[in-house]
Amino acid sequence: MLCPTHGPTTWNPHSCTVVEKCITNLLITTILLCFFNATTYWKLFFGAMFDFIHYQLLFRNSLSEILLLGLG
């Protein structure tokens, strides 16, 4: 896929055909796009979870304060 020349470890981009270059570029682009999409999804997911927990704690604190004030 990386268009190797005669040796097993050497890599020469000029030996690639146009099709091979296109396929390699497409693969790299796809992997990068998937990676960036995944990171943004994870950020959104964790952000939403954090907000939810944060608001739950705030809600519980305000409820207990209201109850304490009401009972006191």
Curated annotation (Swiss-Prot):
Q: How does it sit in the membrane?
A: Single-pass membrane protein
Where is the protein situated, by its record's location annotation? Membrane
Q: Keyword annotations for this protein?
A: Membrane, Transmembrane, Transmembrane helix
GO cellular component terms, alphabetically, are: membrane
Give the stretches traversing the membrane: 23-45
- What is the official name of this protein in its record? Putative uncharacterized protein C806.11
Which organism does this sequence originate in?
Answer: Schizosaccharomyces pombe (strain 972 / ATCC 24843) (Fission yeast)
